[in-house]
Regions:
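Extended ligand-binding clefts on enzyme/binding-domain cores
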Residues: 1, 5-10, 162-216
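Short amphipathic alpha-helical coiled-coil/interface segments
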Residues: 152-164
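Acidic, serine/threonine/proline-rich low-complexity intrinsically disordered regions
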Residues: 141-150
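Short amphipathic alpha-helical segments with heptad-repeat character
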Residues: 150-153, 177
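Residue position in alpha-helical solenoids
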Residues: 139-142, 166
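Short beta-alpha connecting loops at secondary-structure transitions
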Residues: 111-120, 141, 180-186
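An acidic- and aromatic-residue-enriched active-site/binding cleft used to recognize and process polar
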Residues: 28, 38, 77, 101-102, ...
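Aromatic-rich carbohydrate-recognition surfaces in CAZymes
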Residues: 1-109, 118-140, 153, 193-196, ...
Length: 216
């Protein structure tokens, strides 16, 4: 559910929103969003999640959609558009929470880096998850819901601590590991390890990891 960037969003807001609306309409009742939602090959997905590619969800589709909606609000100041998608936003967050395995506070599952199999606890999505929580906090502030703000802040602190403890090896974020932190793959330096850091800074939400670690 990737936007074509700041220019596309800023100057073609309605076109950008039409894409976000399509992904929202194709959201499964469980809260996940598919990569190929229907319009990619054969036609539009229908409202309520009926699409030709059932059950092909990826974690970062939900995260990307959430982040884009908040970025739209911050670019336009349109609270009503954000509120119109609030039910879907909460459903997508509930889905992401459901993907947390026992002993972990970071969702586990496939992502759009789908060309080969990745470790369960994956440095790319760990950072994106932290940015998703930054976005959820911004949603709470935008609509005046302190419970969302508090939930997002507490979850961010917990998940960030876990990511640093399990994935940071003193030089870079390891490719990934098992949910309990075992079998950490320090022999692979994955180029997408700071994707969440980039997204958060681009959106103006600050760092998801300490800057001394990022610069390492």
């Amino acid at each position: 559910a990737a936007s074509w960037g700041a220019f596309y969003q800023k100057f073609f807001t309605q076109l950008d929103r039409s894409e976000m609306d399509i992904f929202a309409d194709a959201m499964d009742p469980e809260g996940y969003i598919l990569h190929f939602i229907g319009h990619y090959y054969v036609g539009m997905g229908t409202v309520g999640g009926r699409v030709p590619t059932e059950k092909g969800w990826m974690l970062d589709n939900a995260s990307g959609w959430i982040i884009q909606l908040v970025k739209d609000y911050e670019q336009t100041g349109d609270t009503e558009y954000l509120k119109a998608h609030l039910t879907g936003l909460k459903r997508a967050m509930k889905f992401l929470y459901s993907r947390m395995p026992q002993g972990s506070t970071i969702p586990v599952g496939p992502t759009t880096y789908d060309d080969f199999t990745h470790p369960p606890l994956y440095s790319y999505y760990a950072g994106v998850w932290l940015t998703t929580l930054k976005a959820y906090e911004a949603i709470g502030k935008a609509i005046g819901d302190e419970s969302i703000v508090k939930q997002a802040q507490q979850q961010f602190a917990t998940s960030q601590k876990e990511a640093l403890e399990k994935l940071w090896n003193g030089r870079f974020f390891a490719y990934g590991c098992e949910p309990d932190g075992s079998k950490r793959l320090d022999n692979v330096l994955f180029t997408g390890q700071l994707a969440g850091q980039f997204l958060s800074r681009y959106c103006g939400w600050g760092d998801v990891y300490p800057m001394d670690i990022v610069k390492a």
